[in-house]
A protein has these predicted regions:
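Active-site HxH/HxHxD metal-binding segment of metal-dependent hydrolases
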Residues: 43-49, 56-153
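Conserved beta-strand hairpin/beta-sheet module of binuclear metal-dependent hydrolase folds
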Residues: 4-58, 174-188
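Divalent metal-coordination and catalytic microenvironments
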Residues: 12, 31, 40, 72, ...
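C-terminal regulatory/interaction regions
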Residues: 257-327
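Soluble or luminal CAZymes and related metallo-dependent hydrolases
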Residues: 47-50, 144, 203-207, 255, ...
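Short alpha-helical segments that sit at the start of domains
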Residues: 242-261
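Metallo-beta-lactamase
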Residues: 43-46, 151, 159-247
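Residue-level marker for buried hydrophobic side chains located in beta-strands
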Residues: 37-39, 69, 92, 182-184, ...
Length: 327
């Protein structure tokens, strides 16, 4: 069993590493303003296994948490919200567009994860996959739906601006502490993906590219990521300082363009180009830049990234759904 890992890199900020499933890992951030706040809560057991021990080392407990800030509504970032609320009666503030899927697990699975089974001809296994997935999270309450540009005052000089960064989800945001140059990103800046051999999880590629444009206009000293992301040339540490952080943003943009360009070439504007054929052709080009490991049966990445291929397939074929035509 993985033990909790803490990294206090600022007097008011501590990173808390959490683990879930066989290979899953999510980074949370404890903020110390006038009270205690956490950015994201991980999966359902993360509060007890990882957040509580980190708080105990500081003489606090889960009941002392006053606020949860979510970067988006996915299970590995908001799946522990309900547990923290049960212990502390704290409020949950979440991007408005992600609040629904955080509270409705069936909708979240169907919108984001069902396609993996469908695209790999495993639809018959989808219900079992959903049942296993639901063990990782609980529906999240939401007290406040955050809007782009809001400034959240947490006290002791900690004011966080809500920066809209759709791409991973439509509602994804970063929290920008302008005074210190800290950007808390969740999954908004995804490098080459969080699992070696996979691809970044991008459901809305055009939005993702625009989000990279926006992020590059910010004065960032410390990039606080939601996972240990792979990149082209940098170590996988999830807190990146100075020029390393800026380089990671550039590489994230570059890799997104590599994936998009490879899929555009693969479909060559042909409406109805079968997804699997296009994906295999695109991956041949992508592997020239990123060491993607492929499943011998499906020809797709063994460890995630189908979304980046599928969303770009939709983008360049003009198809409305991969499942309305032959995959």
């Amino acid at each position: 069993m993985n033990m909790h890992t803490d990294f206090r890199f600022h007097p008011q900020v501590t990173q808390i590493g959490t683990y879930w499933g066989e290979k899953g890992h999510t980074e949370l951030y404890l903020l110390e303003g006038d009270g205690l706040a956490v950015i994201d809560t991980g999966c359902v057991d993360a509060p007890e296994r990882f957040i509580a021990p980190a708080l105990k080392e500081r003489g606090s407990d889960l009941k002392d948490v006053q606020l949860i800030l979510n970067t988006h509504g996915h299970f590995d970032h908001a799946g522990g919200n309900a547990s923290v609320v049960a212990a502390s009666a704290c409020e949950v503030w979440m991007p408005a567009q992600d609040a629904v899927v955080a509270g409705d697990l069936d909708q979240q699975f169907d919108e984001f994860y069902l396609q993996d089974s469908q695209l790999t001809d495993r639809s018959h296994m989808a219900e079992a996959a959903k049942a296993d997935w639901k063990k990782l999270c609980e529906p999240s309450p939401v007290n406040r739906r955050l809007q782009a540009g809001e400034v959240l005052s947490l006290g002791r000089g900690m004011e966080l601006r809500v920066v809209p960064t759709p791409g991973h989800t439509l509602g994804s945001v970063c929290f920008y502490w302008e005074r210190e140059g800290f950007l808390f990103t969740g999954d908004s800046i995804a490098g080459g993906g969080s699992r070696p051999g996979g691809l970044p999880v991008i459901y809305h590629p055009q939005d993702y590219e625009r989000s990279m444009d926006l992020v590059e206009t910010l004065d960032i000293n410390v990039l606080c990521l939601g996972h240990h992301y792979v990149s082209l040339s940098l170590p996988s540490e999830s807190v990146k300082f100075g020029r390393i952080g800026k380089r990671f943003i550039q590489e994230s943009r570059e890799l997104a363009r590599v994936i998009a360009g490879a899929m555009e070439s693969a479909v060559d504007g042909r409406l109805g180009s079968p997804f699997l054929d296009a994906a295999v052709a695109a991956l041949t080009k992508i592997q020239e830049r990123l060491p993607v490991v492929l499943n011998s049966e499906t020809g797709l990445p063994v460890d995630g990234g189908t979304s980046a291929l599928y969303s770009n397939w939709l983008r360049y074929t003009g198809a409305s759904s991969a499942f309305a035509t032959r995959i």
